[in-house]
């Protein structure tokens, strides 16, 4: 009897449930291990400034991913997807086979080739939110929740969200808790363990 009581008390003292706590998945954020040498990341890995590029901390494993960037201050910038082989010190990105980005002028570049372009009257401005969808074939751009019908493709391999800044640009990233509802079928970036 005394053994049962001690066991019960030990269980209550150690948290009471007797269950092993689940490990919480880390949040996707900008990855300070994969950024340019003159990049500054602040706001818990959600804001980029300085000069250069930075990858997000999780690759796009699931079929349809969505993420957003809010333009806090204009300048030179670009957003899209890239492999870990991209040179994050050499901007603008989109000049090689390792990145596919939309630049601040509305042009989408991959392998130094313009793949598409936003209409001239729809260029992102300070305060705008740019959403990106990626389905392992096509990247598409949304401006303040509106599909810009501006697809681009061509990149191969495991890709990560990427952003670069220069000339006083400041961008905030949203990998969850979005400003705008993702398009049907698209969702926040999931870590590989969350998919299976």
Swiss-Prot record:
Originating organism: Homo sapiens (Human)
Gene it is expressed from: SPRYD7
N-acetylalanine modification, residue list: 2
Domain B30.2/SPRY span(s) in chain numbering: 2-184
InterPro entries named among the record's database cross-references: B30.2/SPRY, B30.2/SPRY_sf, ConA-like_dom_sf, SPRY_dom, SPRYD7
One Pfam family linked to the record: SPRY
Keyword Transmembrane: no
Protein name (database record): SPRY domain-containing protein 7
PROSITE patterns: B302_SPRY (PS50188)
Superkingdom of source: Eukaryota
Keywords attached to this entry: Acetylation
């Amino acid at each position: 009897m005394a053994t049962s009581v001690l066991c019960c008390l030990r269980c209550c003292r150690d948290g009471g449930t007797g269950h092993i706590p689940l490990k919480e998945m880390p949040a996707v954020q900008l990855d300070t291990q994969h950024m340019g040498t003159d990049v500054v990341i602040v706001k818990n890995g959600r804001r980029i400034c300085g000069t250069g590029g930075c990858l997000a901390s999780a690759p796009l494993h699931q079929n349809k991913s969505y993420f957003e960037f809010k333009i806090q201050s204009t300048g030179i910038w670009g957003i899209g997807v890239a492999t870990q082989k991209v040179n994050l010190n050499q901007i603008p990105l989109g000049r090689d086979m390792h990145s596919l980005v939309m630049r601040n002028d509305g042009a989408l570049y991959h392998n130094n080739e313009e793949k598409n372009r936003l209409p001239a009257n729809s260029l992102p401005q300070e305060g705008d939110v740019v959403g990106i969808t990626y389905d392992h074939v096509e990247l598409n751009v949304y401006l303040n929740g509106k599909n810009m019908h501006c697809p681009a493709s061509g990149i191969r391999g495991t890709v990560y969200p990427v952003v670069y800044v220069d000339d006083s640009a400041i961008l905030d990233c949203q990998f969850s808790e979005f400003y705008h509802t993702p398009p049907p079928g698209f969702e926040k970036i999931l870590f590989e363990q969350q998919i299976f």
